């Protein structure tokens, strides 16, 4: 089946939905056309009375290539349907709706044509609201004619406004409200790695300290490099970008920023711990290999154990040479129910019978029955000392956990019920 026939079938399927019903179904067809880009379907829905202004709803997970909560203009912008974007605005949809969501979607998805159109459109509207004159590079137009041009000539703004004209409009001696919107849009472009849009917005004069942080978080290394090379004076320290990149596991960004001369000074410990907390093994290894023994501490190992990151724990012990001389390591693993970490510690020689079999007592008390079975399999006798392990786990415990422990004992060690006082 060729693509044209396929598109026609899709159109016919959408038509069948809203031709049979009234009301919400034409809006459903309108929504589909914004997602799929079917301009004929869109126009037909409008002619049938579908409303575009203020229409939004939650989209569920079965919708592909759409944000979670959107309006129609954002849907069209997110999916790159320029014709739909223009028709929505012509039909009365306000680009400012939902805090310029459509502009931000287009920035993040790298649809430069849509971004330029929305920016230029808002530049004109700003001048209209200010009662000023709009001067294009190609001609001078009285302000009274602008609204007519917007309604009649769809492509006029997009095709005739140059960067210089828009820049002069937006960035006067006192920055206006829309210049702040452009600054915010730069963040979305940085997050999406949209280099063309990033350069366009920067050429307009956009500036936002959060853009480089956002690019670092999302691993947009090219954006990070470009912003640094632009030489902007960021009020936020690059060290914070390193920490955020490390927190999200963007090891390439971390490596680039550090090796560009931005060493972690006073925040190494925090950066390392937050990276371990989220379990980014490659980033942890890079930081440890670069900063050496400063990273191989008991606190770092406890952090890895608490979060159940057995691979990081193994790296710190085996490669970092951390000694297993702290009973808190095995107690923490059992307390948190991390059986893989417990197995690692036992395999490396830690004693699982410390303090009168405290690990299995903790495991039973916390209802980590998989760990209980593992330790029994390693030789711990749950019946020893007249059921002391079971009695200890029941004493002072919550009603919910007591009932679960009793059920476990009943199902697996019914002979112990006679010697346990509940």
UniProtKB/Swiss-Prot annotation:
<dbReference type="InterPro" id="IPR036770">
    <property type="entry name" value="Ankyrin_rpt-contain_sf"/>
</dbReference>
<keyword id="KW-0040">ANK repeat</keyword>
<feature type="repeat" description="ANK 4">
    <location>
        <begin position="181"/>
        <end position="206"/>
    </location>
</feature>
<feature type="repeat" description="ANK 9">
    <location>
        <begin position="325"/>
        <end position="354"/>
    </location>
</feature>
<feature type="repeat" description="ANK 6">
    <location>
        <begin position="237"/>
        <end position="266"/>
    </location>
</feature>
<feature type="repeat" description="ANK 8">
    <location>
        <begin position="296"/>
        <end position="324"/>
    </location>
</feature>
<protein>
    <recommendedName>
        <fullName>Putative ankyrin repeat protein R789</fullName>
    </recommendedName>
</protein>
<feature type="repeat" description="ANK 2">
    <location>
        <begin position="68"/>
        <end position="97"/>
    </location>
</feature>
<keyword id="KW-0677">Repeat</keyword>
<dbReference type="Pfam" id="PF12796">
    <property type="entry name" value="Ank_2"/>
</dbReference>
<feature type="repeat" description="ANK 7">
    <location>
        <begin position="268"/>
        <end position="295"/>
    </location>
</feature>
<feature type="repeat" description="ANK 10">
    <location>
        <begin position="355"/>
        <end position="384"/>
    </location>
</feature>
<feature type="repeat" description="ANK 3">
    <location>
        <begin position="99"/>
        <end position="127"/>
    </location>
</feature>
<feature type="repeat" description="ANK 1">
    <location>
        <begin position="25"/>
        <end position="54"/>
    </location>
</feature>
<dbReference type="InterPro" id="IPR002110">
    <property type="entry name" value="Ankyrin_rpt"/>
</dbReference>
<feature type="repeat" description="ANK 5">
    <location>
        <begin position="207"/>
        <end position="236"/>
    </location>
</feature>
